Structure formats: structure tokens, C-alpha cells
Amino acid sequence: MSKSKIPQVLTIAGSDSGGGAGIQADLKTFQERDVFGMSVITAITAQNTTGVQGVHPVPIEMVKQQWTSVLSDFNVAAIKTGMLVNGEYMKAVAEVYKEVASIPLVIDPVMIAKGGHPLMEKSAVSVMREILAPLAMVITPNIPEAEALADMSISSKEDMVKAAERLQEKGCRNIVIKGGHAVDESHADDLLMLENGEQIWLRSERIDTKETHGTGCTFAACIAAELGKGHSVEESVRTAKKFIQAAIRSHLGIGHGHGPTNHWAYRKEHE
């Protein structure tokens, strides 16, 4: 095992050939938050800012082998999951995670790419809800993902609270429902429902841009990085909110579609 005191954080997700989301976004975020990042790749995708052209899942046994390889040599301080393809991958992740359940787990329940391409089989939603999500310290669904997981429609802040309560009834601990898909045109209100039932609303100005590829990955990765450094759930989520807002504000103008965010913007703003 490594003896370094540098926080070491693991991401389990798909590879984005365009570099804006998935493993690539996670590792950039880890670097910016001063933690050492490792990765387990669940799928190789051919994608760019205009969409996903192909998905090639990595064999489940290879996913397990990558994970056990990392765990055998590194002091993993936090784990973040992203694209997990289907229920069998989720069950495999849950199986291995139960052996290291003291490590904080952040789940980004990735279901659909920014361009609309499905990244999770519909049949896997129940596996995510019943088996994997209850293992997480934090789960970070957007509105459509929260609707699928809570099996209800969300059209108001009251609905967001109700969805979070439903997820807690299923065993989820701390839930962040991201309000970026909500109807409020001026603000994005995220709900952090702590495991003790406390509701914390995090409001930010809505930024008028389509340069939002990888925002969900980046947000969850930042939470994992902060948890890996020993911060509380609330502190970690608040930092991640500031980090992603800076990244969206200072987008890079790369590509011809939904471009990536600027992962070094938060650091530049605070230099």
C-alpha cells in the first residue's frame, strides 16, 4: 500500500474521446482539486461535442480487475462512479465496493449524454435504485435522473424534496438533485438533502450557454475529491457548486456542439 499522504481518489466511468466528460473530466477535476486520480474504465465511447457515435463496454471481468488492481496498491480516499452501462456492471461495482464500504462513494447516475444518446439501459434503473445507490454517501441526479430513480415527475421545488425523500426511503443517504433542467429561467436551484433530513438549497445564476458537456461528471468528481480530503458532505457539495459554476462561466468555445467546461477556471479565479 502507498504511504503517501496525498489524497487518492478513484473514478469508475466511461472514457470520452472528446475529453469533456467521463473519465477525462473526472481526472481533470481531481488534478484541479489537488488529489491524485486513478481510473477504472467501464466503456470506451466515440464521442465529441455533437454527440455519441459509438459505445464499446469493457468486459465486466476487466472492470473488476482494474478496480482490484487499484485497491491493492493505493490508499483510496474516495470513489466516484459515472457511466455504468447496465445492471450487471452496477452489480459488479456493488460487489467489489462492499469489501471497502468505509470509503466514501459518490454516484453520478449517468443515464443520457448531453446530445441525447442513452448511456444506461432502462432496465438498469431499478438496479441503480435498489442495489447501488443505497451504498453511496452522496448521489447526484439531475432532474430527469431523479424522476427515473424516484419514479415520479418533477416540476417544482416541492417535487424535488419529495423525490429526495423517496430516494432516502430506498436507503440513499445524502442526495443532491441538480436543478439545471428545471423551468426557472433565471436561476439553478440545487437541493442537498442530508441524511438527517436537513434541506439545503444552493442557488446560482443560470448561465445562458450550451457549453455544458461534462458538467454532471465534473460536479460529482469535485464532491469526491473534497470528501477524499476529509471535508464534510455539505462542505464538499458547496465547493463543487462553486467549482462547476466557474467552469461553466469560463467555457472554452471548443467544438461545434455542446462544448466542454473550463476545468481550471475556479483555480484561475482564486489565484
Feature locations, PLM:
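Short pre-catalytic strand/loop immediately N-terminal to key active-site residues, enriched for Gly-Thr
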Residues: 12-18, 199-213
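Charged C-terminal helix
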Residues: 6, 57, 234-271
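N-terminal phosphate-binding or glycine-rich loops at protein starts, especially the Walker A/P-loop
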Residues: 8-32, 237
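Conserved N-terminal subdomain of the carbohydrate kinase-like
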Residues: 2-11, 31-115
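Short, small-residue alpha-helix embedded
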Residues: 24, 147-148, 209-233
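Phosphate-handling active-site elements
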Residues: 33-38, 198-200, 226-240
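Conserved phosphate/ATP/ADP-binding segment of small-molecule kinases
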Residues: 122-199
